[in-house]
UniProtKB/Swiss-Prot annotation:
Notes concerning its domains: The presence of a 'disulfide through disulfide knot' structurally defines this protein as a knottin.
Protein name, UniProt field: U31-theraphotoxin-Cg1b
Lineage: Eukaryota, Metazoa, Ecdysozoa, Arthropoda, Chelicerata
One Gene Ontology molecular-function label: ion channel regulator activity
Location within or outside the cell: Secreted
Similarity section: Belongs to the neurotoxin 03 (Tx2) family. 02 subfamily.
Function: Probable ion channel inhibitor.
């Protein structure tokens, strides 16, 4: 009986220590991978206008150009030509327009224009 308990205890100790070694090995692999990735990464930020300069209906290049919380730089197709302009109205229906303005405001918030 004592031999059985000793064998079971030694197997449990061996399995726990093996798992701990495996966990430490994967943590080291992750650290090495992050270090390798970190050396080759080059982050560049695109310069955007600090203040809005366009009103609704004027030509634009990005959401940061357009003034207003719910005004975005959208596109309109005229024939085969695509024109970008500031716009805020999304629908003729008042309820859908209100929902669209809210969605435009959220999209404009994620444009990260620092004004």
């Amino acid at each position: 009986m004592k031999l059985c308990v000793i064998i079971i205890a030694s197997l449990m100790v061996a399995s726990v220590s093996g798992r701990l070694r495996k966990i430490k090995g994967t943590e080291l692999d992750k650290k090495m991978l992050l270090e390798k990735l970190g050396h080759g990464m080059d982050i560049r930020f695109e310069e955007t206008p600090r203040e809005c300069s366009k009103k609704a209906g004027e030509k634009c290049e990005s959401n940061c150009d357009c003034c207003g919380y719910s005004t975005l730089c959208g596109y309109i197709t005229e024939g085969k030509e695509v024109k970008y302009q500031c716009m805020s109205k999304t629908s003729n229906n008042e309820i859908l327009n209100t929902i669209g303005l809210g969605m435009n405001a959220i999209e404009n918030m994620f444009s990260f224009c620092f004004r």
